[in-house]
Each structure stands twice: as C-alpha cells, then as structure tokens.
Swiss-Prot record:
Interacts with UvrB in an incision complex. This is UvrABC system protein C. The lineage of its organism: Bacteria, Bacillati, Bacillota, Bacilli, Lactobacillales. The keyword DNA damage applies. NCBIfam families: uvrC.
Length: 614
C-alpha cells in the first residue's frame, strides 16, 4: 500500500457511494458500491484475502470515490460506471447475449419475422426464445398455418410461397386489412398458449379433406396437429396462472457466484440464462449489480413479474426493473425460485468438478509423474522426434508441454544439416546439441524433463550430449512404442529401466498425448518439406524463376497439379513474366506427361510453432 492510498483512506466518509480502483496506468480496474465507503474501501487493504481479491489489490495504486444519497443510488451509479468503463475485475455480461423474438410487424399487411431487437414500433413481440433454432421451429410451424406475406417489398407477381400456400399474395387476392389483423390475433393467441381453437380448426379441415378423398391435404393437416402437440410437450407448464415472469436464483461457493434466470412465458419455462463469475463484495450486493446489468444490457422484454430470493432487497430491485417484484413465501412461485437456486448450485458444483478433473489431468498428472521418477514436478516438458523416409529430407521436431498442456508458441522444427542417410541416432545427437547448446549460450530456462520419442539408443545419445558434452543436469526419459506403434513403455534412470507406470493413470495419458503430438508435428513438417522439395525440383532450371517466384506460385496454386492445369495468363497474374510463365508450362507439360503423385500434396507454410532453431 503506497503513501497516496494511506492518505486517502484517512479521508473516506462513512456515507454510501461508489469507489473506483485504478492501476499504475490510471486505468479503472474495479468499480464497487458500499453502504459505508470508509469500512468497505479500507477492508481491501487490511487482513488476508482469497487469491482473486489478492490479485485485484496487488494492482491498485490509486482509488477515487463518489458519495451518493442512498445505497440504491449507489447501485444505479455503479451499474452505469461498469457499463461505461468495463473494468476487468467487475461482473460483466461480456457476450451481451440477445435472445430472438417472433414479431408480427405493425404494417398494413403484417409479416411474421424473427428479430433480436425489441423496438417501440407498434409490433407484437413474443419471446424470448432460447435460441434462433427454437424460434425458427415455431415460425416454420406458424408459416404453414398462417399465410402472412413474406416479402419486404411486395413483388408485382405472386411468389413461391403463394404456390405452396404460405402467402396470401394480397396484391392479387385483395384481402382487406381486417383479415390480416384477425390472423395476427390468432397468431397472438397461439403464441400465448391458446391453441385449442387452432387445433379444432385443423381437425375440421382434416376431416373435410379426408371425406373429399384429398388424402395428401388431410395428411398435411394431421402433421400440423402433431407438430403443435410436439411443441406443447417441449414447453413444461411451471405456473397455472399462465403469466410471463423472470425467476432469479443464485448460489455462492469458494468465491464464485452462479446466477440462474428462468424465462417463464405463458406459464411455460422456455429457457434459462446461466452466468458464473467471481464476486468481491457481499453476495447479495453483487447479485443486485448483476440484475441491473441484465436488464440494462440484454435485449429482452421486461415481463409482468420478476421473482427474487428472500435475502434480496426488494426496493433495490424495483429501482432497477420496471416490473412487479415479488419475494414469494409459498406456493408454486416459491417453488420456481427454489428451482432456480437449486440449478445455480448444480451449475457451480459442475464447474468445480470440471476444474478438479482438469487439474487431475494436467497438474495432478505432472505431480504424480515427478513423484514416480523421483524428480521435481516437471512443469515444463520438452519432447523430440525424428522423421525421414530412407534418409530423404530428414527433420526433427520439438513440442513443449507446460503444466500438462501444449504450449504451441514454443514448438520448434529442425532441418537435419550434418547427417547423410537414414541415421536416427546421429539426427538425435544433432538436434539435442543444437537445442540445448542454444539454451546454454543464451541462458534460457531449461526444461524440467526431456522426453525422447524412442528407445534406449536414442535416450543414451541424448544423455551423452546433455550430460557429457554440455554438462547440464536435466532428467531425460524415453517413450518406446509397441509393434502397433502405440505408447508402450517409459524408460528412465541410470541405467535405463522400464518404469512401473499404470496404463490407466493420468500420467500415462499425459505421456501418450505428448508422444502423439511430437510425432504429429514431426511428420507434418517432414511432409511439407518433402512436398516443397519435390515442387522445387520440378521447377528447377527455368530461367527467371527464382525461389521467391516459386514460393508465390505455390502459395497461390497450392500444388504442382494446379500450376500444370493453369493457363499462362493465370500464371502471369501471380506476378510471373509471360516468357517465364510460358517456360513453366513447357516444363510441366512436356508432351502431356503426367506429374508424379507427390505433386498432389498441399503445402501449408503457416503452422503452429513455425520456428526453426539454428
């Protein structure tokens, strides 16, 4: 705590208000509210805190405060300050998720559309729906029943929808406005759950069609009735009064809060909104902040009622939401709030369970591996593999795992420079010498463990270079594969021995992932190099076609076959002079001969870890 903060802490009033924490750059990193500014702000700089609060406090170099007349005024100010400044430590509805609505437009001849924007334009809005797929499903059903116009600008001729019975083509059939308003009312009734009349009408039409032996049309009516029934079953009735309401529940544990919002429309639970985030203040105060942001940021209609838990300040919510606010004591409304709270608890428990499993797969795996090999926990593991075909285009690759996860920015690729022919041991010697010679020269941080994709011979070569040539003390292990090319044994120690490692353990799965990844990276690099070399050999000896133009051709056409099939004009468009383009075509198409198979391979010059060690 610096002297500026110490001085300001002495000046804090006991009034309600907002406080604003800033970092060394003057950036606002957190906005909070308090009933008593002095007590709240001082609490950040006294005593111990959990990890997330310690992280916040470590960045605070200054703070400001704004006094308000009441705690509710402080709440409203806090929400506006968060919206304006977007502090990184505050609760933020970052995705600004907007839900789809079905809308009947306020036009002379109305349309039925899906929108995410609710406007005061006289249109009728129904929703929100959980996603655009659910909204489209209902709209498709409505389109089959109600022939609203589909075109934004009505055409002079009838459209496709007219021919399939989904548009009245009002410019031709001359239905009056009253007809369409009546149809809009039927849709409104349907979306409010009053669909019995529509089903009765469809049943009557189905019976008439069947009596007239129009069986295809009768089947269409039957399918519509079944579709309505299916839609009904998907929407569970949660309240008998068929009202629209949002139901809030929250749960806190281990410094995290989960808020669940149930969207109940016409008594049916149609969707829920789930948000999990760390909290820094009293849970009920951070919950109020969330509610304020929810209705300020979300594009969704405020319902007739909002149900909240018992421990929340009802008057504060009323200041945030222009709706009837209830804290139900009993009955089905109380059950709805309890259900939202229960779901919030389950969601938070699932988050912690997933975190524990993730730690078990990564941090737990490297800790167990360290104990098994009797070395410090191998936070950073570097693994090597070689790749060549009969000694051609020999390469090696290194992948890096940090805390049990791949760190692709640290991957490295090596072209073998000193080895002639297929000599895996010599290739391993070269790449280990190059990598750790550089680590030694540039004082880079060495890994905690080196894993060689290979058996005893490759591991011993690596040991010779690391320990005898370079004098480094880095543990080295080897991963042997079986005859099915699967991870089989872990070799470690001096002399090397097979480590007793359970094939069902997380540490074995980690080593398996490392071996698979380094093999993938090495073989991918080898294929790229081999294809590139084949490409170069095919175009060698053409005057005016240097390395840069060859590379441009490959980037544009992707393969020799595509270049061979291209016209001279198309090659010229890549920046190759016409005389050179003609020479390329003559070289690649001598009397119509076919190109070798390898020319079909594509080359991608942009891969992860696209770095070559010296």
């Amino acid at each position: 705590m610096n002297n500026l903060i110490k001085s300001k802490l002495e000046l804090l009033p006991t009034s309600p208000g907002c406080y604003i924490h800033k970092d060394k750059n003057g950036t606002i990193i957190y906005v909070g509210k308090a009933k008593n500014l002095r007590n709240r702000v001082r609490s950040y700089f006294r005593g111990s805190h959990d990890t997330k609060t310690e992280a916040l406090v470590s960045e605070i170099v200054d703070f400001e405060f704004i006094v308000t007349e009441s705690n509710i005024e402080a709440l409203l100010l806090e929400i506006n300050l968060i919206k304006e400044n977007k502090p990184k430590y505050n609760i933020m509805l970052k995705d600004d998720k907007s839900y789809p609505f079905i809308k009947i437009t306020n036009e002379r001849y109305p349309r039925l559309i899906i929108t995410r924007q609710v406007k005061k334009d006289g249109g009728l809005y129904f929703g929100p729906y959980p996603d655009v797929g659910a909204a489209n499903e209902i709209k498709r059903l409505l389109d089959r029943i109600f022939p609203f116009r589909k075109c934004t600008n009505p055409p002079s001729k009838v459209c496709f929808y007219y021919h399939i019975g989904q548009c009245m083509a009002h410019t031709i059939c001359k239905k009056d406005e009253a007809y369409f308003k009546s149809m809009a009312q039927e849709v409104s009734d349907f979306l409010k759950g009053q669909d019995d009349k529509i089903i009765d009408d469809l049943k009557s039409k189905m019976a008439v069609a069947a009596q007239s032996m129009e069986f295809e049309r009768a089947a269409e009516y039957r399918d519509l009735i079944q579709a309505i029934g299916t839609l009904r079953t998907k929407q569970r009735v949660m309240a008998k009064d068929l009202q629209n309401r949002d139901v809030f529940g929250y749960y806190v544990d281990k410094g995290w809060m989960c808020v669940q919002v149930f969207f109940v429309r016409q008594g049916k639970l149609i969707e829920r909104d789930v948000n999990l985030f760390p909290y820094f203040n009293d849970p009920d105060e951070d919950f109020l902040t969330y509610v304020g942001q929810f209705y300020q940021e979300k594009s969704h209609l405020v319902p007739n009622e909002v149900l909240i838990p018992q421990d929340i300040d009802e008057e504060a919510v009323k200041a945030l939401v222009d709706s009837k606010i209830l804290k139900p004591q009993r009955g089905e409304k109380k059950q709805l709030v309890n259900l939202a709270i229960k779901n919030a608890r389950v969601s938070l428990e699932q988050k912690f369970n997933l975190l524990e499993k993730s730690v078990e797969k990564t941090q737990g795996a490297i800790e167990n591996l360290g104990r098994l090999l009797q070395i410090p926990t191998p936070v950073r593991i570097e693994s090597f593999d070689n790749s060549n075909i009969m000694g051609t285009s020999p390469v090696s690759a290194m992948v890096v795992f940090v805390n049990g996860k791949p760190s692709k920015k640290d991957y490295r690729k090596y072209k073998i420079k000193t080895v002639v022919g297929p000599d895996d041991y010599a290739s391993m010697r070269e790449v280990i010498r190059r990598r750790y010679g550089r680590v030694q020269r540039e004082a880079l941080t060495p890994p905690d463990l080196i894993v060689i994709d290979g058996g005893q011979g490759q591991v011993n070569i690596a040991k010779q270079v690391i320990q005898e040539e370079l004098g480094l003390d880095i543990p080295i292990a080897g991963l042997q594969k079986n005859d099915k090319h699967q991870t089989h044994e872990l070799l470690f120690g001096d002399p090397l021995e097979v480590v007793d490692l359970s094939r069902n353990s997380q540490e074995f799965f980690l080593l398996q992932r490392i071996q698979d990844e380094v093999h993938r990276f090495a073989i991918t690099f080898h294929r790229q190099l081999r294809s590139k070399n084949s490409f170069s050999s095919q175009l060698d000896g053409i005057d005016g076609l240097g390395p840069k133009r060859k590379q441009n051709l490959m980037r544009h056409f992707k393969s020799l076959t595509k270049i061979k099939e291209a016209s001279v004009d198309e090659i010229v468009e890549v920046g190759v002079p016409r005389v050179v383009a003609e020479a390329v075509q003559r070289k690649l198409n001598p009397q119509g001969e076919a190109l070798p198979q390898v020319a079909e391979e594509r080359v991608d010059y942009q891969t992860e870890g696209n770095h070559n060690e010296p």
